[in-house]
Amino acid sequence: MADAWKDLASGTVGGAAQLVVGHPFDTIKVKLQSQPTPAPGQLPRYTGAIDAVKQTVASEGTKGLYKGMGAPLATVAAFNAVLFTVRGQMEGLLRSEAGVPLTISQQFVAGAGAGFAVSFLACPTELIKCRLQAQGALAGASTTSSVVAAVKYGGPMDVARHVLRSEGGARGLFKGLFPTFAREVPGNATMFAAYEAFKRFLAGGSDTSSLGQGSLIMAGGVAGASFWGIVYPTDVVKSVLQVDDYKNPRYTGSMDAFRKILKSEGVKGLYKGFGPAMARSVPANAACFLAYEMTRSSLG
């Protein structure tokens, strides 16, 4: 139980560090993912990541890059407590004897279990965040574009109240749960396995206790990049479902969204916002893992 509390505290600190560093990149990613497909002959609202940054800062100021941070900030303790605590508990179940490091394949399984558990928190949190981040990109969409364009949200609680009142109650907050599973389970499995594998590569063996902060930063960056490298299309599907109009939906489900994106935009449509996501993943996850390791070490 003592280890669980240490994982909880360390995960909370790591998650806060990740959020502060990575949220502006995430805002741009969601804006690019959720902007409506332009009519033939017209340009999209944002021509790329840099253009999205310029337009966001011009219309909303720098604070626009941090729009929607209240939702993940309010739940960062619970989110990372679940992620790192479940991972720690699964490590205990998988470990053959006390003090023996897990194999990389066992780290993969532990990460998958943590990803499954955290999906139940990630889905409603990210639905709220995506609605807030995307409303600027959707504001110019026509009422026939089947996106949530008319609703203007005042903040995270306003989104939650609207969904609970007008979109099927609590079930509405879990819109996009399937693609959230499809992202979090393989993504976290790969991320934790890659993190441990790279640490062992740098240490030259399974004892990684002597690694310095620079090595932990590199390992965290590699881990973050590996997460997005394998699951990014599922994140695009999740985002478009979560900002889709409840009354006049464009998509009937995850597979329908996948097929329609592929048909209308090609494979590149499944990688909208990939640049900002990868640019975010390296520093944000480096900050997360470094903060986690330092806090965990200080707790003994």
Swiss-Prot record:
Summary of the knockout phenotype: Chlorotic leaves and impaired growth when grown under ambient air, but normal growth under CO(2)-enriched air.
GO cellular component: chloroplast; mitochondrial inner membrane; mitochondrion; plastid
Membrane topology (UniProt): Multi-pass membrane protein
SUPFAM superfamilies linked to this entry: Mitochondrial carrier
GO biological process terms, semicolon-separated: mitochondrial transport
Cell compartment(s), UniProt: Mitochondrion inner membrane
Tissues expressed in: High expression in cotyledons, leaves, flowers and developing siliques. Lower expression in roots and maturing siliques. Not detected in meristematic tissues.
Induction section of the entry: Up-regulated by light and down-regulated by norflurazon and lincomycin. Low expression in the dark.
Transmembrane intervals: 8-28, 64-84, 108-128, 176-195, 211-231, 273-292
Gene3D superfamilies recorded: Mitochondrial carrier domain (1.50.40.10)
Classification via PROSITE patterns: SOLCAR
Record key words, sorted: Membrane, Mitochondrion, Mitochondrion inner membrane, Repeat, Transmembrane, Transmembrane helix, Transport
Family per record: Belongs to the mitochondrial carrier (TC 2.A.29) family.
Function: Involved in photorespiratory metabolism. Acts probably as a carrier for a glycine decarboxylase (GDC) cofactor or, alternatively, may act as a mitochondrial glycine shuttle. Involved in the transition from the embryonic stage to the juvenile autotrophic stage.
Full protein name: Mitochondrial carnitine/acylcarnitine carrier-like protein
